[in-house]
Amino acid sequence: MPTIAYLSKELKLSSLSEADAALYTDKSLMRKFCKEHSISSPAFCKCTNMLKAKEFFRLQQGKCILKPLDSNCSKGVFIIEKENDIDQYWEESIRFSKCDNALLIEQYIEGVEFTVDGIVTPVGHKSLAISEKRHYDYNPSIAYELFFSNHNDNYDYEELRKINNYF
């Protein structure tokens, strides 16, 4: 995204700004944005070393997620259940960080994960598709299936659309 934003600016094409591209690419910037705009999100900490990550983990008193700041497709993402897990996964996770020698550790929230895909037009955001994710047992942070549907008997997709179309 940052490359597209930069080229679009140089070529005077309509696209995301470089600031918006950074926001969508850097998970710590997105978490800060959510906090500043009163959007509910998990507690988090940008960490440049394991000691800081362990300190945050102890404060949470429960599961956390360790992830690269700027990776996608769940590469380098691990559920942290005990402090030693940070030692085990730190190096592997940081290998997937493309532009910063830091990781994000955040509070783990139990539940179903959804993906909401959409498009931004001059009149606002329009949610186009919602998927319910199914995860591997061996690494529950990696989805093996995204089940797209227009309706779900167990969850209020209209509410998901409404929330996502708000911004």
Predicted regions and their residues:
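Conserved N-proximal alpha/beta basic substrate-recognition cap immediately N-terminal to
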Residues: 1-49, 55
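Short amphipathic alpha-helical segments
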Residues: 4-8, 78, 118
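Short beta-strand-to-turn element immediately C-terminal to the catalytic PLP-Schiff-base lysine
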Residues: 47, 77-82, 119-121
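ATP-grasp fold ATP-binding core
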Residues: 34, 57-80, 97-111, 116, ...
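ATP-dependent carboxylate/phosphate-activation module, predominantly the ATP-grasp catalytic core
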Residues: 84, 107-167
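Phosphate- and divalent-cation-binding pockets in alpha/beta enzyme and binding domains
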Residues: 2-3, 88, 115
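Acidic/polar active-site rim loop that often engages polyanionic ligands
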Residues: 11-13, 33-39, 67-72, 141-146
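CheY-like receiver
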Residues: 55-56, 89
